[in-house]
Amino acid sequence: LICLLIFVIFVESLVAKEVNIYTSRHYDSDDALYQEFTDQTGIKVNVLSGKGGALLERLKFEGKNSPADIFFTVDAGNLWKVQREGLFQPIKSEEVLSKVSSNYRGPNNEWTAIAKRSRVFFYNPKRVSSKEISNISYESLADDVWKGRIVIRSSNNMYNQSLVASLIAKNGEKETEIWAKALVNNMARKPQGNDRAQIMAVANGEADLAIANSYYIGIMLSGNAGIDQLNAAKKVKMIFPNQSGSGAHVNISGAGILKNSPNPDNANLFLEFLLSEKVQKNMVKKSYEYPIAAVQISDEMAKFGTKFIEDDTSVKRFGELNPTAIKLMDRVGWK
């Protein structure tokens, strides 16, 4: 009876509290996740949305008085920036650590992947031959055959910085610099626009191949982004690079518990909630990402295959090599 009473008091103390999330994810579907967590636990979710850099500056300004419990963002590089400032604490939940392999967790287990995405190729099948895409890789985009045919966004984009960092980790800085210089020479235009703009350029005949994150094609095919993007998405095909070798570059959406979290127990519960099978299934069906748990992906993404060879480079390397990647991209004239 005493043990039961202690448990009830513990649960009630959790219910009485809240969890405060700083997020740079911009998915409307996340709001439904927050509400589901509240419905399931009784814990109120307070959300502050913004750009990753602005939220990081806010955390630094707030210091020990910060109300934030969790930092939720996209790209391992952004999580690394928060960790570099000493703003995370190690995740102690065995439930979380047992579900996420070490290459998808940060140093010291200070952050974890919640979902995955791959940086893939989108091509126009009317302008790219089957021979050209056979055994295609990131490295092969340096070949002369791609001169004036490739579009990709700017070098100040974190997704590209992390891709280059992963290539440095795999191939070394010197070889990656040679590759990046050739890639710049093969671009169809000066980098401009977001990932979807690259896919649109291929669909519209401005280029033959785009490098972009996988989930964008799901968003476009869903029709939620409008008829123009839906029609464009139907004109292109997606392919995973490096399937005969090291595998396609994989990055993450991820989260960590902040060092000065006033509600660390609730924060741990929230991470466990995000990695539960039911939530993983619902989340990736709406965000078009790939799950951490072994659950079904969205119908839109399943059209391109449910399994692919993933590069197993630890995502923590993307942050560690970020400064090197930025300098390299600058040296080769990647605008």
Predicted regions and their residues:
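Early extracytoplasmic/lumenal segment of secretory-pathway proteins
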Residues: 16-81
